[in-house]
């Protein structure tokens, strides 16, 4: 599964029918970030219940600024992560051999571009600058710089998409901001499809890889997990619960394609 030149096709032949079905769903469930999200709404950084717990210490204005900074830090990482996903999908599109896989990745490129758009708009509404987490930056560059197709596609479709699904599900359940929930609901619909595509494609492709190849990819994903664990030091809520749930989910997805995630 080494990196290769693009594969050209003389006929439209489908090797993985489940991917063709997924591509049909992808075409059906496209959405427009400009018309399907009401961006005129203000951001709500905290709930009344949350403020009740801190009102003896903070004014509403001060607490709003604190929560806006926290949220800006989180969404800065997400904005960067979606740009990385966009770049990774473009790399993978050039390397994958099957035409139906190219179709799915082409659709995912459009999805990732839309996610960059909505997270960028949300950051503009927060109007707070935040730094990029160095461990997350290293993780992304580790993926982008890999010259091994198996590392890159497992890292993208199983690891990053697994993290995204878990994180966005948490936001859906806990965010006090209706604008954020609407935005994340649409993004999550895409990310769930991406994660499903990864399992469908890789369970088909990994049936014939060697033990050494499996070990190499497992080592790579384990390194990604360690970097992510280091990066997730604070901005994602109850960190230990989130990390455990995310680890379990990624480990499950890897198991479906015959790989193991080691803590």
Enumerate the predicted regions with their spans:
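Terminal targeting/low-complexity segments that flank the catalytic cores of oxidoreductases
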Residues: 1-88, 94-102, 125-132, 147, ...
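Alpha-helical transition-metal enzyme core signature, strongest for iron centers
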Residues: 78-86, 108-123, 154-168, 187-198, ...
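Short, charged, amphipathic alpha-helical segments
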Residues: 103-107, 182-185, 215
């Amino acid at each position: 599964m080494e990196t290769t030149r693009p594969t050209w096709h003389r006929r439209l032949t489908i090797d993985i029918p489940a991917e063709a079905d997924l591509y049909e769903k992808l075409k059906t469930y496209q959405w427009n970030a400009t018309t399907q999200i009401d961006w005129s709404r203000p951001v709500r950084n905290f709930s009344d219940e949350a403020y009740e717990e801190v009102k003896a210490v903070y004014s509403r204005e001060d607490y709003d600024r604190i929560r806006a900074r926290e949220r800006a830090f989180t969404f800065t990482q997400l904005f960067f992560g979606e740009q990385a996903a966009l770049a990774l999908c473009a790399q993978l599109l050039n390397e994958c051999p099957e035409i139906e896989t190219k179709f799915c990745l082409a659709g995912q490129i459009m999805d990732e571009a839309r996610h960059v758009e909505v997270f960028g708009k949300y950051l503009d509404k927060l109007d707070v600058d935040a730094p990029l987490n160095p461990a997350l930056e290293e993780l992304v560059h580790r993926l982008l710089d890999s010259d091994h197709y198996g590392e890159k596609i497992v890292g993208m479709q199983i690891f990053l998409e697994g993290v995204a699904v878990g994180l966005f599900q948490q936001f859906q359940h806990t965010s006090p901001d209706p604008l954020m929930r609407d935005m994340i609901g649409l993004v999550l619909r895409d990310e769930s499809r991406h994660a499903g595509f990864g399992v469908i494609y890789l369970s088909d492709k990994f049936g014939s890889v060697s033990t050494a190849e499996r070990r190499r990819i497992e080592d790579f994903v384990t390194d990604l997990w360690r970097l992510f664990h280091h990066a997730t030091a604070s901005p994602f809520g109850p960190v230990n619960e989130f990390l455990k749930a995310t680890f379990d989910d990624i480990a499950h997805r890897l198991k479906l394609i015959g790989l193991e995630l080691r803590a």
